[in-house]
Curated annotation (Swiss-Prot):
The gene is rsmA. PROSITE patterns: RRNA_A_DIMETH (PS01131), SAM_RNA_A_N6_MT (PS51689). GO terms for cellular component: cytosol. Keywords: Cytoplasm, Methyltransferase, RNA-binding, rRNA processing, S-adenosyl-L-methionine, Transferase. S-adenosyl-L-methionine binds at N24, L26, G51, E72, D97, N118. The keyword Hydrolase does not apply. This is Ribosomal RNA small subunit methyltransferase A. It is found in: Cytoplasm.
């Protein structure tokens, strides 16, 4: 593989970073190699990359995968990455906002699909939510995100980071924390640490619930009023006190507990009893 230096490419094209788009390009080759290694890319994999920047990670992906499709929002990066990747016939570039993309149109008939990306901090949670909630056929997501968000995704019950995002991700995926990435590994340097994590999609959700929408409504209610007891938090579901009391009793959950103490299995039991 050719030497491909992020700083050199940025200087070559006199690229100007956009604060609005949260652009921080990874320059550390060890971190780049760790991302690719932990993505476990096979020669028949179809890789989707969100926010390729100047293509530092992209090139490594192209050397290993069958195809790479990159989605980039910044119009000023389109000619740069197009020119830098012109030697690869297994590369496709889409100029669009990843939050507006129907990934099924990109995936098509591909069977082994993985997402690998250095996600902009400001859209991390919306993108993860979209990718998981809309049921796309990804085997895994290997992503670099703000450490604060990564800590929330990997959190355990009864910790300060445990919340609705934790349960959304762990409902659909196994979570592996790969490594911490320091600000010095980027240009320009962000103000906080980053985290590389890998999310492996489960064949079926971690818990089987009768009504998925209700399940997530129960979770949101519990964490919208995090410091309140479950009894007070669930009042927003507009159930009678009698029905709510029956649901807690049938689920075997003390209504004086707080949402942050419940496991995903307990949230499943509670939502199923409320559904009755």
């Amino acid at each position: 593989m050719k030497e491909f230096n992020t700083r050199q490419i940025v200087e070559k094209y006199n690229f100007r970073f956009s604060k609005r788009l949260g652009q921080n390009f990874l320059t550390d080759n060890t971190v780049l190699d760790d991302i690719v290694e932990n993505a476990e890319i096979q020669k028949d994999d179809f890789i989707i990359e969100i926010g390729p920047g100047v293509g530092t990670l992209t090139r490594r992906l192209l050397e290993k995968a069958k195809k790479v499709c990159a989605i980039e929002l910044d119009e000023s990066l389109i000619p740069i990455i197009t020119n830098e990747m012109k030697e690869y016939d297994n590369f496709t570039l889409i100029h669009n906002d990843a939050l507006k993309v129907d990934f099924n149109n990109i995936i098509g008939e591909e069977q082994s699909v993985k997402l690998v990306a250095n996600l902009p901090y400001y859209v991390t949670t919306p993108i993860i939510s979209k990718l998981l909630n809309e049921g796309y056929n990804f085997k895994s997501l290997t992503i670099m995100i703000q450490k604060e968000v990564g800590d929330r995704i990997a959190a355990k019950p009864s910790t300060k980071d445990y919340g609705a995002l934790t349960l959304l991700v762990q409902y659909y995926c196994d979570v592996k924390v790969v490594r911490v990435v320091k600000p010095s590994c980027f240009i320009p340097q962000p103000k906080v640490d980053s985290l590389v994590i890998r999310l492996d999609k489960l064949e079926k959700p971690r818990v089987q619930v009768k009504d998925e929408k209700l399940f997530f409504n129960v979770i949101r209610s519990a964490f919208n009023m995090r410091r309140k007891t479950l009894w007070n938090a669930m009042k927003g579901l507009k159930l009678s006190s009698e029905d709510l009391e029956k649901a807690f009793e049938a689920a075997g959950i003390d209504s004086k507990r707080r949402g942050e103490t419940l496991s995903i299995e307990e949230f499943g039991k509670l939502s199923d009893e409320i559904y009755r």
